């Protein structure tokens, strides 16, 4: 249903992502933030399901600055590799990349953000610091407590 896209952050960095356009008139847009496993089949499926409900959904590849197009499965070995990406995250860079995703869909209508695991924490911080968001949902964002103040 969706397709790969290129997004440009405010510092000029180009990152990949996945975009699924709404079936029928768009109700708005959602930025979908990945778990530590990248924009893999699961995150693409989440975007496709939101699109089937009438939302444009875009998932920025927030690890592209470290390893372009990183995607992982869920085996113990793959989890160990994926965890290396979050050992010392660059929050400023991730937020620039998320803002690029927000900007890419802001013409659609109201924009919300939803994230899972690391993405849940990113969604929380994005809602507090970035422009253009009307709603945010963070699922099991373990790093949220670091930003509670």
Which functions belong to the PLM regions below?
Residues 1-149:
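N-terminal cap/leader regions of alpha/beta-hydrolase-fold enzymes
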